[in-house]
Every structure is written in C-alpha cells, then in structure tokens.
Design a protein with these regions (language model features):
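Structural signature for solvent-exposed beta-strand/loop edge elements and short helix-capping sites
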Residues: 18-175
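Positively charged n-region of N-terminal signal peptides that target proteins for export
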Residues: 1-3
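Bacterial N-terminal signal peptides
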Residues: 6-13
C-alpha cells in the first residue's frame, strides 16, 4: 500500500516531463527550449525528440521545434501542453503564435485560429463553448481564472443560431 502512495504523484503528473530535464536545453526569449537531439545550421536551431518550450504558465511539447535565431521565432508541428492552466493542442507554431488551437479548462472549451504567446496569451478568431453559450469572438485573452472575449456574437442555446446576442465584451470565469 505504501509503495502505491509513493507512486501516486508520478501517476498524477502531466505526460510531459520538465523541459529542463531534457539532454539539450537552452534559454530563449520565450523560455527554455529543449529536446533529445540538437542541430544548428545557418541561424536555425533544430531541437528534435520530445522537443519542448517552457516558461512559467506555458509548457509545450512537439516532435520537433525550429528556433529561428535572427527573428527569435519558432516553427513546430502538432503541439500539446498547457498555457495558463488551459490544456491545449495546436496544429502548428509559426513565429510566436500557435495555429489552429484547441483549449479546455473546467467546463469551457475554445478554439482559436491563432494564439499569440504573450503574457497572458491572446487568441484571434475564437470560438468558445460554455454549458449555456456558444460564442464567436474576434479576440480573447486567456488567464488561469477566465476567458475575456472582445467583439463577439453569442448563441445562448445549443439549438442553433435562431437567437443571437451581439456584444462588445464578455467575461467567462473558469469553474
């Protein structure tokens, strides 16, 4: 029994390991970049094998990440991880933005065409689904406690868009 209690924290830990524990790690403007293999050619650093990007409030993992040294930006496919406590999956990363992103926290689910890796992260072209609302918004800011949407159109029922509410701003708290 005691043995299982010691293993419990390991089993409850996220699937990705800390970026600092990878064999190759370097510090970038956006946080720690790490992976199992590292190569460098003409200003492009390629990190492969459980590649990761991590800083407080952000932990991403991808098959590989390219760091474009001169621009300070990134290229990566199929990312997963967390941002400000929101679980996320993204089809890709270009520069300092995640592309075609799915986010989830509590009862809220969101999709964004782009998620800028600012502090806090800002989404563009957002669709948010709460238990009672479906919302399309031009922009959203995601924090650990809320999703703040600007310039949006809401459908308050799952029955479709027969009823629409247009507003300048709305705040959805994470439960």
């Amino acid at each position: 029994m005691r043995r299982w209690l010691l293993l419990l924290p390991l089993l409850a830990a996220p699937a990705w390991a800390k970026c600092a524990d990878r064999p190759y790690v370097l510090e970038t403007e956006e946080g720690l970049l790490g992976g199992e293999n590292l190569s460098y050619e003409e200003g492009v650093l390629l990190v492969e094998g459980r590649a990761c990007l991590e800083r407080p409030g952000l932990a991403l993992e991808a098959p590989w990440i390219r760091y474009l040294e001169e621009e300070g930006g990134f290229l990566a496919p199929r990312l997963s991880g967390e941002v400000e406590g929101w679980r996320l999956q993204a089809e890709g990363m270009e520069g300092k933005a995640l592309l075609r992103v799915r986010l989830a926290k509590g009862s809220l689910r969101a999709e964004a065409e782009r998620l800028l890796l600012e502090r806090p992260p800002k989404g563009e072209g957002v669709f948010l689904e709460a238990p009672a609302y479906r919302v399309r918004a031009e922009r959203a800011t995601f924090t650990g406690e809320e999703a703040r949407l600007q310039g949006f159109l809401a459908t308050p029922c799952p029955c479709g868009e027969d009823l629409r509410l247009a507003m300048e701003e709305a705040l959805f708290r994470v439960d």
